[in-house]
């Protein structure tokens, strides 16, 4: 706590000194700060102000910091051969909501954009299983998942295209029960994205029950009953 208090005093004194300057530089802005203190520091530096009294350049690997900023305030910096390339997140359309909901993804190198929360859970479950078998985790390799909301089949491809423009490697995992617009899918693939889906006309739950053995289905139902109760599971089956 003494360390945090000391850091907080240093941060505030830095801000006071910077108030009379035009530029402030901060490396790893989240270091030593609890989330609510980090949010307050960013506010103090003008994260929510429209004016430009102080120009701040800072680095961060914190999703908490990213959520406190607008897309126009965030830049992705990558090394390409012998140079660095800087891309402004706000230059990409329809990105602000993704920054708020899936801030962790912007700190990754490779992203799996999932149609909904079920696909995210499925991917994380497989990753955990493979990790327990001795394979390197997707997260350890710099990967992240994005939940596109599951509302429209085009949505995950549109979000995937937006992330491609920022230099991320992107894979879309989508259901096949509601076909997306072909031109949207083609634009995503033309930009370098990849996608996987189930067999024709199937969603995740369809594919699971068509692919699992009888014993596997029994285990899946037993797990559902254990979590949600027999009555609720029975109502959904009806």
Model segments located where?
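Anion (oxyanion) recognition and catalysis
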Residues: 50, 164, 189
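Conserved helicase/translocase motor-coupling segment
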Residues: 110-186
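Conserved nucleotide-binding/hydrolysis micro-motifs of P-loop NTPases
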Residues: 62-65, 81-82, 118-119, 176-179, ...
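Hydrophobic/aromatic beta-strand patches that form the interior of the parallel beta-sheet core
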Residues: 57, 75, 171-173, 196-197
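Activity-critical C-terminal alpha-helical subdomain
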Residues: 175-238
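Switch/communication elements of ASCE P-loop NTPase nucleotide-binding domains
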Residues: 1-104
């Amino acid at each position: 706590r003494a360390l945090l208090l000391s850091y907080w005093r240093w941060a505030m004194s830095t801000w006071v000194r910077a108030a009379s300057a035009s530029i402030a530089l901060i490396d790893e802005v989240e270091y030593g700060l609890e989330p609510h203190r980090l949010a307050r520091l960013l506010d103090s530096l003008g994260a929510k102000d429209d004016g430009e009294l102080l120009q701040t350049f800072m680095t961060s690997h914190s999703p908490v910091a990213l959520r406190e900023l607008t897309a126009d305030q965030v830049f992705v910096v990558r090394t390409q051969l012998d140079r660095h390339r800087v891309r402004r997140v706000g230059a990409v359309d329809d990105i602000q909501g993704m920054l708020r909901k899936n801030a962790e993804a912007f700190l990754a190198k490779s992203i799996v954009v999932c149609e909904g929360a079920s696909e995210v859970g499925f991917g994380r479950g497989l990753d955990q299983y493979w990790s327990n078998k001795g394979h390197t985790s997707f997260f350890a390799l710099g990967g992240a998942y994005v939940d596109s909301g599951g509302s429209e089949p085009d949505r995950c491809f549109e979000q995937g295209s937006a992330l491609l423009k920022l230099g991320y490697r992107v894979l879309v995992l989508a259901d096949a029960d509601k076909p997306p617009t072909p031109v949207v899918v083609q634009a995503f693939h033309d930009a370098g994205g990849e996608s996987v889906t189930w067999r024709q006309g199937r969603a995740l739950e369809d594919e699971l029950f068509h692919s699992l053995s009888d014993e596997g289905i029994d285990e899946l139902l037993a797990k559902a009953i254990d979590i949600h109760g027999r009555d609720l599971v029975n109502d959904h089956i009806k």
